[in-house]
Structure formats: structure tokens, C-alpha cells
A protein has these predicted regions:
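Extracellular/periplasmic carbohydrate-active domains that bind, remodel
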Residues: 5-428
Length: 428
């Protein structure tokens, strides 16, 4: 599509009215988007002002541009939000079966959203404006309170989201199923539950985003060829949480900072748990192999543990590589790669990394673990690193620092076939 021939339309031309909380502008905005698409595509402008709206539908080859000072604010009426409508089979992405956290794309309560992109391509949203999810609660939603997602994508490709902000999401800021060749760039997400949650992705990138979320900042799984780069991540749960196996994932130059600035809605906590949590099968069956996970030049500050890998019984793992990881004020939970059953990891490579832990000054800890089953452990019997069911662990120029006292051993290997290299220990 030629930029010289593309259409530029304002939502004002279709009857949108700013700064009036009693008006639902969804009809006007959707007419503008539809008209732009019918004319071959282009840009739909949202001028400065606050526009209250229910569900909006993106179309192929149309960019929704939020001008400076423009705010799309979700309607306060739950009835103004539609559920996802699609013929796609998304059942493999269901999770939390049998719990209050069960979610399914076919559930009309779970799949409500403010902005939809379904089966479209070459479309997206750009700033520098703002989207306000309005924190609309739904007593029939997950945990009996979660409301509509702010943006929901399904079966989309070649999408671009950049240079805008999202606040007060009533559930996830962005939820996506089966997307490809999609970019999330320079987004600022504040509050709500998960920030960007993608289930099923091929060739996506998340870069230069700033996330201050109550739940996991970035999450999902079944990713291939995914890049997460130069993001600032602050969470009252986990920074990055992969709950389904993925391959060729590159996480680089991200900074993880705790505690969270926005409390977790359910528990009220603000402590950041794991910087990067790779947990296929953690929220229900998610069979498959996780492989080629590369973590490079990331910084962790004031989190419980920097990296955790836990395989489910239906999973295996190939290579997990960690390079130039820096950690400061890490809690008393060791970096770990393990499975509690027999699921194997082929190799873990950790290089050029420097992690400082806060010690747990308790003489009785080493003996406490004797005879205890794994599910009774509140943390690991080692303070720095813990490996279980790994074929090969390679350590090169790794320094583990201990602030304070801790009587546990620094590193523990359980059912590890080969260990190459060692870590340098530095204690107070």
C-alpha cells in the first residue's frame, strides 16, 4: 500500500464526541475504521481529548493513531464489552483448569476486550496517546473480579503497536493468541494484571517497553523466534513468565526491578518473585520441548530469585544459556534449573555473570532439609544455584556473592551428569 495514497480519517468525522462520559463512542470509532479499510487502508486519527468507548475492532491495513493528548477510555458499563468471536481452535492455550484462574478463549467472560484484532494483518495502534482500561470489574470473570482485557488479538500477522501507554487494565493489557511477525515497541504499561501475554507466537519482538504491572509483566508461551529486548520490567509477581514451552527465545538487555509499584490485585503483595520464570506446564498441561533459550546482558535488582526453570512431566529442555547476568539484592532463593519428576534438561550454560544474594542467617537450615520432600521446601538447600535432572552444566567466569551469613552450600547438583567449570564465591 502506497503511503501517498493511504487514507487519513479522523474519528470526529464519524460523530465521535470527546470529554463526555455519557457517550459511548464505539459506533463512531468502528465506522471510521471500517470506512478506512474499505477505501484501501490508512490511518484513523484519534485527536486530543478523552473518548469513552466500548469494544473497538481493528481492520487489516488500518493503523489507529492516538494523537498527543488523546485518551481512549473504556466504558464503565461491562455490557459495552463484547467477547471474542472466532472460528479458530484455541483450546491448546487454555490454562488453570479446575481453579479460579481457569481461562479459555471460548469463555465469553474471560474473552471480553476493549480493542479487538481478529484474523487481520498489517494493522496496529501507534501513539503518543493513551488507553485507559478503566478497571472495569466483572464478578463472573477470573477470580470473580477480572474484567475485559484492554487489547485482544487472535490469528493476526504483521501487526505493529508502538509509542502509546496503557493504564488501569481490567485484566491483561495485551492478550494475544497465535500471532506472527508482530512488534510491540516503546509501550508503557502501568497497573492491571499481566502486561503483554502471548499464547502462540512466531517471529515477534517486544522492545524498549516499560512495564509496571500488578501481575506478570510479560507472559505466555508456545513462542518461536521471539525477542524481548531493552525493556524495563517492574512486577508484583514475575517479570517474564513462560507457562508453555518455547523455542528460540532471546531475552536481552532488560532490567528487572523490584518491588512492584502496583500491588498484585489478588494478594496485595508488591514483592517481585522471579525475574525470568520458565515454567512450561505450570498452569496446566502444556506438552512439548523448550529449547534455545538465550538470556543475555540482563540486570536483576531486588527480586526473590533471578532465573527459575521448572519442567513439567510432559516437557523436555535443550539448551538454556545465560550470559552477562548481573544480580543485586537477590533474595534467598537460588537460581535454579530443574524438574521434580524425571523431565530432563540437556545443557545449562552460564557465563560472565555476577549475582549477589542476601543470606539467610539460620544455623539450622542445612539439617532442616533432611527427610523433607520437595513440596515442603520453601526455598532450596543451596543459596546460589540449584540444578536437578540436567545432563550438563557449564559455568565460566561466574561469581556468586553473599551479603550476610548463610549456612547452606552455595551450589547443589542433583542428578547432574556433567559439571564443567566452577563459580567463584565472595562472602562478607
Amino acid at each position: 500500500m502506497s503511503l501517498l495514497l493511504s487514507v487519513v480519517i479522523s474519528i470526529l468525522s464519524f460523530g465521535a464526541i470527546a470529554n463526555n462520559d455519557s457517550i459511548n463512542n464505539a459506533g463512531a470509532i468502528n465506522r471510521a475504521i471500517s470506512t478506512c479499510a474499505q477505501q484501501g487502508g490508512g490511518t484513523v486519527r484519534v485527536p486530543a481529548g478523552t473518548y469513552v468507548t466500548g469494544s473497538i475492532y481493528l481492520h487489516s491495513r488500518v493503523t489507529l493513531r492516538l494523537e498527543r493528548g488523546a485518551i481512549l477510555r473504556g466504558s464503565a458499563r461491562l455490557a459495552d464489552y463484547a467477547p471474542l468471536q472466532t472460528d479458530m481452535d484455541l483450546s491448546r492455550y487454555e490454562s488453570g483448569q479446575g481453579t479460579v484462574n481457569y481461562n479459555s478463549a471460548t469463555d465469553p467472560q474471560w474473552s471480553r476486550a476493549l480493542i479487538f484484532g481478529v484474523g487481520i494483518h498489517h494493522a496496529g495502534i501507534e501513539g503518543p496517546g493513551h488507553i485507559d482500561g478503566a478497571d472495569v470489574r466483572n464478578p463472573l470473570g477470573e477470580e470473580h473480579m477480572r474484567g475485559p482485557h484492554t487489547i485482544l488479538l487472535a490469528g493476526c500477522s504483521d501487526m505493529r503497536f508502538r509509542d502509546f501507554s496503557i493504564t488501569r487494565s481490567a485484566n491483561y493489557a495485551i492478550l494475544a493468541y497465535q500471532i506472527a511477525h508482530t512488534q510491540f515497541n516503546a509501550l508503557t504499561i502501568t497497573g492491571g494484571w499481566d502486561g503483554i501475554h502471548v499464547r502462540g507466537a512466531c517471529h515477534i519482538s517486544i522492545s524498549r517497553c516499560t512495564l509496571h504491572t500488578g501481575d506478570d509483566a510479560l507472559a505466555g508461551g508456545y513462542w518461536t523466534d521471539t525477542r524481548i529486548d531493552r525493556c524495563l520490567i517492574n512486577s508484583s509477581c514475575n517479570g517474564i513468565r513462560m507457562i508453555m514451552p518455547s523455542e528460540r527465545v532471546y531475552i536481552s538487555r532488560c532490567r528487572f526491578e523490584g518491588p512492584g509499584t502496583h500491588p498484585h490485585h489478588t494478594s496485595g503483595r508488591t514483592a517481585t518473585e522471579t525475574g525470568i520464570y520458565l515454567q512450561p506446564g505450570g498452569w496446566g498441561k502444556a506438552p512439548g520441548r523448550m529449547d534455545q533459550i538465550y538470556i543475555d546482558r540482563c540486570q536483576m535488582y531486588n527480586v526473590l530469585t533471578p532465573v527459575t526453570v521448572t519442567l513439567g512431566d510432559d516437557n523436555t529442555a535443550g539448551t538454556i544459556s545465560i550470559n552477562r547476568l548481573t544480580g543485586r539484592k537477590i533474595g534467598h532463593m537460588a537460581l535454579s534449573v530443574k524438574s521434580w519428576g524425571t523431565a530432563p534438561t540437556d545443557r545449562v550454560i552460564i557465563r560472565n555473570s555476577d549475582i549477589e544474594y542476601i543470606g539467610k542467617d539460620d544455623h539450622s537450615l542445612p539439617k532442616w532439609f533432611h527427610g523433607k520432600s520437595f513440596d515442603q521446601w520453601p526455598f532450596f538447600p543451596s543459596w546460589g544455584m540449584y540444578f536437578r535432572n540436567v545432563h550438563t552444566v557449564k559455568l565460566h567466569q561466574v561469581k556468586l556473592r553473599l551479603s550476610g551469613k548463610d549456612y547452606r552450600q552455595a551450589i547443589l547438583y542433583d542428578h547432574v551428569d556433567h559439571v564443567q567449570g566452577h563459580a567463584t564465591l565472595a562472602t562478607d
